[in-house]
């Protein structure tokens, strides 16, 4: 009887511990949760390669503790659809697929629930690109203009309750970069959510090549796909600002968490 009484007291004493643990759970990975692929080109413009090399290191640092596997490639010709589909997301830093085979594999990957995080030049397309699917995928049409040289810019959050922007300030300064403007209006499209834009307070924007106005989204998602495009990615300063880096991590986590097979972070 005394032993039963002692066990009851012990059990009751543990209740607050278990309650606290449930209120503040921690989910430690017992194995890598998923695989991600980083793609960039060493043959791109020098400033884009600078960004890409830093980008590779940025995402590699996120693997510390083996939370996920990260593969890096400079050739998508080695990744047909059957291989691409092994990855929860593909991160393109300064280039996009080339040629019919690479493009077809990427289209199939995205149409079947693949994840894509694209930076700056990875989304560049003009009338010579001749890839209508990619233009629709991005939602912005073809290239219109850009500022030059790379400059810092004030950015405004458009959607403050989105997972990518919910912990960002309403406005913040982006590190120096070149930013693209596009031909088509993203805001009139039901399938596009604009998350971040350059503030009109930046105008006139540029020293050599000057942009005088216009709506300028720089981060958005196409709701028909598991994707996000981030317009920044020129030079070696893009990872120098904590708020922007936080947004990059948010974007990565959001894309990964929406894997059709289930949220890897819940494993």
Regions found by a protein language model. Name each.
Residues 23-34, 58-61, 201-218, 222-267:
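Extracellular ligand-binding/catalytic regions of CAZymes and related secreted enzymes
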Residues 27, 35-126:
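Helical hinge/lid and interdomain linker segments adjacent to catalytic or ligand-binding clefts
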Residues 96-169:
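A glycine-rich, often tryptophan-bearing local segment used as a flexible ligand/cofactor-contacting loop or short
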Residues 115-117, 193, 226:
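Proline-centered loop/turn at the N-terminus of a beta-strand
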Residues 148-224:
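Catalytic beta-strand/loop cores that center a nucleophilic Ser/Cys/Thr
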Residues 1-4:
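Positively charged n-region of N-terminal signal peptides that target proteins for export
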Residues 54, 58, 86, 101, ...:
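Extracytoplasmic/secreted proteins, especially bacterial periplasmic and envelope-associated proteins
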Residues 7-17:
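Bacterial N-terminal signal peptides
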């Amino acid at each position: 009887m005394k032993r039963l009484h002692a066990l009851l007291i012990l059990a009751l004493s543990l209740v607050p511990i278990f309650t606290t643990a449930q209120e503040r759970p921690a989910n430690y990975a017992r194995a890598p949760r998923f695989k991600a692929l980083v793609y960039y080109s060493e043959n791109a413009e020098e400033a884009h390669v600078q960004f890409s090399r830093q980008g590779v290191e940025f995402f590699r640092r996120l693997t510390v503790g083996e939370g996920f596997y990260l593969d890096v490639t400079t050739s998508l010709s080695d990744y047909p659809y059957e291989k691409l589909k092994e990855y929860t997301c593909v991160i393109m830093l300064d280039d996009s697929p080339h040629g019919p085979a690479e493009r077809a594999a990427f289209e199939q990957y995205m149409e079947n629930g693949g994840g894509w995080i694209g930076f700056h030049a990875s989304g560049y397309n003009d009338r010579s690109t001749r890839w209508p699917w990619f233009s629709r995928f991005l939602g912005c049409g073809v290239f219109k203009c850009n500022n030059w040289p790379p400059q810092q810019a004030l950015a405004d959050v458009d959607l403050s309750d989105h997972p990518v922007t919910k912990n960002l300030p309403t406005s913040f300064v982006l590190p120096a970069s070149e930013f693209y403007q596009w031909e088509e209006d993203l805001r009139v499209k039901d399938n596009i959510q604009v998350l971040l834009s350059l503030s009109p307070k930046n105008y006139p924007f540029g020293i050599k090549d000057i942009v005088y106005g216009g709506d300028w989204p720089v981060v958005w998602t196409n709701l028909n796909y598991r994707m996000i495009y981030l317009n920044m990615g020129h030079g070696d300063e893009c990872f120098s600002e904590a708020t922007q880096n936080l947004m990059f991590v948010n974007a990565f986590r959001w894309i990964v968490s929406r894997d059709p097979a289930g949220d890897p972070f819940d494993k």
